Amino acid sequence: MRVLHAVTLHSTTHAFGGPVRVALNLCGSLRERGHDVRLTALADGFRRPLPEEVEGVPARLHQARRVLPLGFSGLTSPSLLAGARRLVRQADVVHVHLARDLVTLPVALAALRAGRPLVLQTHGMVDPSERLSARLLDAVAVRRVLRGAAAVLHLTAHELRDLDAVVGGAGLDRAVRLVNGVPAQPEGPAPEGPPRILYAARLQARKRPVDLVDAAPAILARHPEATFVVAGPDEGELDAVRRRIDELGLAAKVSCPGPLDAARMTEELRKAHVYVLPSVDEPFPMSVLEAMAVGTPVVVTDSNGLARDVDRAAAGRVVSGPDGIAPAVLDLLGPSVRRSASAAARKLTAETFAMDAVVGTLLDVYERAYTGSQA
């Protein structure tokens, strides 16, 4: 099957985060099964000529251009817009990782106009909004593509309710739950040396990286040799993180290495004794799945989409707010507790979030979409 995946942005800083990681994981697994899969996206930070593949996946990348002061939503590319129709006509199924932007929406509209089966995956990015730009895009395009898609993939019941609210009326009638999958990782040795606590996600307000810095003194009181890593592309919180590090006198204990590529991310996760993601209302974070896949116990908040799974499997700890982070980390640093949580984390990802099962479900969706388009 010929499948086109469209995602907003692939950059050297990995600024678009989880949706790109999900798209690449799916593309790689589909290619392993013999399917002809291609990726299209904007590109930023690369030297010319732009890469023609990403992690082994053939890619048609277009230099990002900012046309509106709206974050990722204000980026586009004339060449991508001009070539969208040709790209979708070459595919049997078009899979769009949909956001309210000037990349994925035009590709989705092109697929509908070309009569190609359209599968949408929103990653929690399309929810009810009072912003004028969101309301305009919803009226002009978002509702149209959601209603016209052969399938709309959602992660959680909360996300589905949001999508129904955006669509209005009776809501979606072609919704399919598809969890994020994570590739299997070989079991490695437990991390050695002093405790190492990791945060690796975008540095933005909702993800609350400062909360980990605030938890550091209480952890250091019990483990004075511990170190902390706050990694990820800056989306407005790096200055606040650095300011808090200075205020608490933690410059020798907390490092901020910036964005991590896929290989470095895996390396850092393996070196970490505990992975902490303090974010609120996080739909289904790939970084937490990746941490558990290598056996690193996690600390997440109770509004995290994976909180129930983590709690039930005892693959880490779930906290209600910032004050719970330090006690949770200290608990997981106990040798026997960490060993148990590490084994549980690997078991959870292998049994519940394995790529084989996720891709099997996705291929069923593709087959139904393609067959329906031929009827």
Per-range role (PLM):
Residues 297-301:
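Short hydrophobic beta-strand element within catalytic cores of glycosyltransferases
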Residues 4, 189-216, 229:
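Conserved donor-binding/catalytic core segment of Leloir-type glycosyltransferases
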Residues 312-323, 331-336:
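Conserved acidic donor-binding segment of nucleotide-sugar-dependent glycosyltransferases
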Residues 7-13, 28-75:
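N-terminal strand-loop element at the rim of the active site
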Residues 280:
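Aromatic "clamp/platform" in nucleotide-sugar-dependent glycosyltransferases that forms part
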